[in-house]
A protein has these predicted regions:
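Short loop or secondary-structure boundary microenvironments that flank
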Residues: 62, 69, 234, 271, ...
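ABC transporter nucleotide-binding domains
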Residues: 2-4, 9-205, 210-211
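Non-catalytic alpha-helical coupling and interface elements of nucleotide-dependent molecular machines
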Residues: 100-103, 223, 312-316
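ABC transporter nucleotide-binding domain
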Residues: 172-270
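C-terminal coupling/interaction segments
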Residues: 270-318
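Hydrophobic/anchoring residues in structured secondary elements
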Residues: 9, 127, 253-258, 298
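A short linear hydrophobic-aromatic micro-motif
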Residues: 121, 169, 249-255, 292-296
Length: 318
């Protein structure tokens, strides 16, 4: 549904987006991650036709955005960052205006307004003036205009920015529901949103794609993936390190906490395929030494760890 090929954008001598390529299919929810200034918003503006690229091609539903902008934009619902609204209109009036711009009229227009209001939980403010809405309701109204014409593709720039936890949960749930039948891309710097809503994620840094995969595939890149945390009462940290290190061949053992009452050790697998055997070996060592074990827990990788490792060098050079 969305094909981005060798996309670049320069502002003067600054290369904001540098040779970016990726695709998003129907049924996919792509999270576009990156630090501030990485090129997320610029890329999304080029996808929607709001900003022309310096080089490269964007195709939406098979239509080149530069050559057939009207055909491409018919398929897109766009929620820009800080979505502009006509504050002198009511919510219903604004959505009606957006529906007409999208070519809807009569019964189709009325159905589209009702549907968007219901999906975005706007019923209680339907007849309220936009300028009296809270930030959360304004954001929902912006979301509603993006889906008013039931587009096949949704492009959203920071869709939960500024919302409270309950509102964020509502928006993520809505994205997941719509993602079953649409191609969705949304930018964020909130890592928990990727795990909560996305089927795939891209990390962009200094205008370049530096990682691309499912949330689990990205977490597997973490140095903590498939490690084990072992919590033990009444045993010296040095003893724990020695026993685990000597019995579990070349697996690395680090002490996370050596203060009473519990020693906390992290045990790293020798290789990616040894984590199952590693868990069994840890249990055997604990049993043989009659340790008072609080917990043996296998750790999943952490997106924040992967994100930090990938983007840290750029942060240090800014």
């Amino acid at each position: 549904m969305i094909q981005v090929e060798n996309l670049s954008k320069s502002f003067g001598s600054k290369r904001a987006v540098d040779d970016v390529s990726f695709s998003v299919e129907r049924g996919e929810i792509l999270g576009f991650l990156g630090p501030n200034g990485a090129g997320k918003s610029t890329t999304m503006r080029m996808i929607t036709g709001y900003l022309p690229p310096t080089a490269g091609v964007v195709k939406v539903g098979g239509h080149d955005v530069a050559e057939k902008p009207i055909e491409a934009k018919r398929l897109i619902g766009y929620l820009p960052e800080s979505a502009p609204l006509y504050t002198d209109m009511t919510v219903e009036g604004f959505l009606g205006f957006c529906a007409e711009v999208r070519g809807l009229g009569g019964a189709d227009k009325a159905k589209a307004i009702d549907r968007a209001i219901e999906m975005c939980f706007l019923k209680s403010v339907r007849h309220q003036s936009v300028d009296t809405l809270s930030k959360g309701y304004r954001h929902r109204t912006g979301f509603a205009q993006a889906i008013i014409h039931d587009p096949d593709i949704l492009v959203m720039d920071e869709p939960t920015d500024g919302l409270d936890p309950n509102q964020k949960h509502e928006v993520r749930s809505l994205i997941r529901r719509m993602g079953q039948s649409k191609a969705i891309i949304f930018s964020t710097h909130i890592l928990e949103e990727v795990e909560a809503a996305c089927t795939r994620a891209i990390i962009i840094d200094q205008g370049k794609i530096v990682a691309n995969g499912t949330p689990n595939e990205l977490k597997d890149k973490s140095e903590l993936a498939n490690t084990y945390l072992v919590s033990i009462n009444g045993t010296e940290a040095a003893t724990v390190r020695e026993k685990l290190g000597s019995v579990i061949e070349s697996a690395k053992v680090t002490i996370v906490n050596d203060k009473p009452p519990a020693v906390l050790a992290r045990v790293f697998p020798k290789d990616a395929g040894s984590d199952g055997a590693l868990g069994q070996a840890i249990f055997s060592v604990a049993k043989q030494n009659e340790w008072n074990v609080n917990e043996i827990k296998k750790e999943q990788g952490r997106l924040d760890d992967v994100f930090r490792n990938i983007t840290l060098s750029d942060t240090q050079t800014r």
